[in-house]
């Protein structure tokens, strides 16, 4: 049975979309309806990761965060979940999330087009894991491509210490 609405959490606000278009991609919804343009469109095929967003879902009384390619995911997938986009990571007082801070500190991007996707993939990994490892970090960005450097600059973030020693905002 098709629902006549989609209900999800964005920041601390419950959003209800009445009669959602089941063919509208999350990328299109985020950029046109929410008017948030940090999430980028690269390949439109789910291969580059520029459009990566994070969905939070309650599973066995624990929120699990999943990096999702928004260009190949559709609005109905939001139902009952939390949507986190790159614009949501900065705290209310303007402090960067540790992943964003590490990107700045270690010069993790060149032109910046792919940066939001890398940040969201790393954010998902960061939220789901208390212990970070080099393998976990590299695995988390394996679905993201950088056309400028071939992702070489992002591999400078290999050290779990790079992410865990970056400033942690009080609300993250």
Enumerate the predicted regions with their spans.
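Single conserved hydrophobic/aromatic residue that forms the stacking wall/gate
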Residues: 156, 162-172
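Signature of N-terminal electron-transfer/Fe-S-associated modules in redox systems
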Residues: 1-158
């Amino acid at each position: 049975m098709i629902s006549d609405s989609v209900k999800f959490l964005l920041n601390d606000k419950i959003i209800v979309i009445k009669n959602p278009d089941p063919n509208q991609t999350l990328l299109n919804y985020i950029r046109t309806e929410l008017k948030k343009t940090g999430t980028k469109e690269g390949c439109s095929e789910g291969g580059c990761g520029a459009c990566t967003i994070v969905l939070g879902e309650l599973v066995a009384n624990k929120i699990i965060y999943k990096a999702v390619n928004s260009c190949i995911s559709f609005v109905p997938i939001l139902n009952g979940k939390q949507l986190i986009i790159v614009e949501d990571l900065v705290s209310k007082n303007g402090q960067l999330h540790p992943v964003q801070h590490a990107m700045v500190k270690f010069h993790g991007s060149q032109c910046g087009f792919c940066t939001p996707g890398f940040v969201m993939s790393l954010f998902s990994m960061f939220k789901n894991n208390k212990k970070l490892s080099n393998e976990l970090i590299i695995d988390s960005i394996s679905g993201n491509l950088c056309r400028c450097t071939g992702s070489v600059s992002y591999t400078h973030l290999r050290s779990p210490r790079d992410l865990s020693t970056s400033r942690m905002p009080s609300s993250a």
